[in-house]
From Swiss-Prot:
Gene name linked to the record: SNRPB
Locations listed in the record: Cytoplasm, Cytosol; Nucleus
Protein's name in the database: Small nuclear ribonucleoprotein-associated protein B'
Cross-referenced Pfam families: LSM
Sequence ranges of the Sequence repeats: 175-181, 191-196, 216-221, 222-228, 230-236
Amino acid sequence: MTVGKSSKMLQHIDYRMRCILQDGRVFIGTFKAFDKHMNLILCDCDEFRKIKPKNSKQPEREEKRVLGLVLLRGENLVSMTVEGPPPKDTGIARVPLAGAAGGPGVGRAAGRGVPAGAPMPQAPAGLAGPVRGVGGPSQQVMTPQGRGTVAAAAAAATASIAGAPTQYTPGRGGPPPPMSRGAPPPGMMGPPPGMRPPMGPPMGMPPGRGAPMGMPPPGMRPPPPGMRGPPPPGMRPPRP
């Protein structure tokens, strides 16, 4: 039975092969692949070449270069021989198995979340937040209630304090503003700008009773000399 050329080449896959080129260079590497044009792929390849000395008396010296992965064209190939057997660790899986015990240097994927038995990190004392139930408003104040209930409760709590002044809710009425002595009563217009308001009677005394007899009411000009003034309020004028 005749063995084909491709079958012979397949038998030497993963072998260390020595390839000699037309220019005399020698490539030694692990044989990985080929095609019908005898293009070869060698990995971990080393190049060896002989350099002729300038002086004929000196011998030729051999130079080695490390190349790594090489694609060798078949048109430059002269001969190909076996240099050594394939490495022994070719069939060993380099990826750790699922059940294998992990050691230093074995990479593992980081899981999401915090393990169940891991202790929770504690914040420093100065950066920790307030403890629930200690400090801050009470739960009754923070509980949502109807409109006006919270304001009424706050006003009742404030009024229970001894000596606390009465507080008025903004927008719902407040204490009447203080009235000055010369300000007009509510609903009446004041004097024009630049004019001094008339002087009224003292506080607590009804108007018209604090003025002396014969004096006109406040805001009226006195009568000319020789004429009697108007009678005081409550008295009839004299008959002519």
